[in-house]
């Protein structure tokens, strides 16, 4: 599964540009209290002229697929897989590919992967908790007083509404990846490009090495939810909703944050309403409704219908149409592991996992976004976090000295009541039991390597992302004695309706290098080991560039399989091969994220015997946040990652590995 958005090299399109925007000056003058910025270039200015996601040549896809299979298979297995792949290329695969190309030509408004990818997410019947929803936590406000729960919750809510208004008014700066910022990330460029018609604007940006990114996912950020339905869920958005949903102790509250004229409600009133909720002594409900959103999706679909039939239509409509969900937890965070557990799943009592996103805030003001993954890949979420962090810390709506407005919050704030019959109560108790069992099986460990980071690696002409990925390969080999299927998500937002492509970090180069470092370090000089590091870095850079340009193999093979299935054809043999199942059983699922607004990100493993590896390469350190279930030892794995990085940085000092 594509999890968090990758951002570690110059060709990790989405997050790089987003993280640049954190420190970027506003585009035209100072924004007023209703907006985070007022871009002179309309938000969707480039959308119409974005290039289309290319469908790779079938022979390139098969070649890349076999290259990725090589380190995972012995000679006999590889020969069989190679034969099946070539048969596919010259037989049914060729016909399917030609049909896919024709379909794509008839659907120029979108990409060939968009529909199948939505289906993949929305048809999945597993719980979205752990299996799909990731979290990204905010960096603390640099001023401790502003991290008080009421202060930060108020400021983030106001900044979130400023972002909503900015986006809907078309004042949000278009998302652009600047290869030459000195030339294109300038007021002069913006003044010129705004007059280029939308049908040509992308080409104008391209001329100065600037790459506008797809922003089609952004509209689903607010007022949205995933609605459980039999066999395939639906995404639902109602932009008319003006209220915020707040959860505290499993109770649901709503109040307006946008007034009837479309203005943001005064910050002092929002503060008063949140204070009212924080002071409410209503106990946690005996049967907290939020657990139902963690259910298997067909089960939840039946139960939701039962809720509607029980007279809860109005209350559920309020939940679904809220601008977003704010979860106020009544305990502090102890450390990064407890932070990760709480933001990824929590106790389940105080969550509604179906909303497009929730801001979760603990008693000490630690905040994170937990988001539903089907509607987007983190591109919009990361931009939202960057802008909200910047706005709430640089232009906070209230200060610790601010007084709440003298308003009657008991009238403005509505606590939602749900009618539950005995069968619904039993279903909630059952959902809670399943939820507790699944989250109790999850372990998380974090690691910080302090001997170097991005800056040192760049002086050595090594890709920081390649080195991180290599450390995971070495760690797995050290712990389990073999190379395993590895997935790294890479955004294809450089294309219209692009989603993600997979980088396959396990290669013949990483296998050779890992074996040399882990099994036979004394047989190789530091110079020989350094040469292997360079080979790994070069090849990883090539894979990353190909993926970002839509030239991986995973999405193409996925789309061809989807097409065969939709035509009712028998499954081609390439997909029945045990090696195909193995490479898609992603034991190492990895995703990287680096931004000044982000403290930590994480997700659960995508297979029962896997690791979920969130990582970040910073200027002078490397960190990772890893999850696993009980079949794997996650603490030992992060120790092995640390050992691997230690060995790599030792070699970079031209010293032998001890």
Swiss-Prot record:
GO CC list: mitochondrial inner membrane
One annotated GO biological process: fatty acid beta-oxidation
Catalysed reactions listed for this entry: (R)-carnitine + hexadecanoyl-CoA = O-hexadecanoyl-(R)-carnitine + CoA; octanoyl-CoA + (R)-carnitine = O-octanoyl-(R)-carnitine + CoA; decanoyl-CoA + (R)-carnitine = O-decanoyl-(R)-carnitine + CoA; dodecanoyl-CoA + (R)-carnitine = O-dodecanoyl-R-carnitine + CoA
Transit peptide (first-last residue): 1-26
Mitochondrial matrix side: 27-179, 210-658
Molecular function in Gene Ontology: carnitine O-octanoyltransferase activity; carnitine O-palmitoyltransferase activity
Record Pfam families: Carn_acyltransf
Family recorded in the similarity comment: Belongs to the carnitine/choline acetyltransferase family.
Functional summary from the UniProt entry: Involved in the intramitochondrial synthesis of acylcarnitines from accumulated acyl-CoA metabolites. Reconverts acylcarnitines back into the respective acyl-CoA esters that can then undergo beta-oxidation, an essential step for the mitochondrial uptake of long-chain fatty acids and their subsequent beta-oxidation in the mitochondrion. Active with medium (C8-C12) and long-chain (C14-C18) acyl-CoA esters.
The protein, known as: Carnitine O-palmitoyltransferase 2, mitochondrial
Organism, scientific name: Xenopus tropicalis (Western clawed frog)
Gene name of the record: cpt2
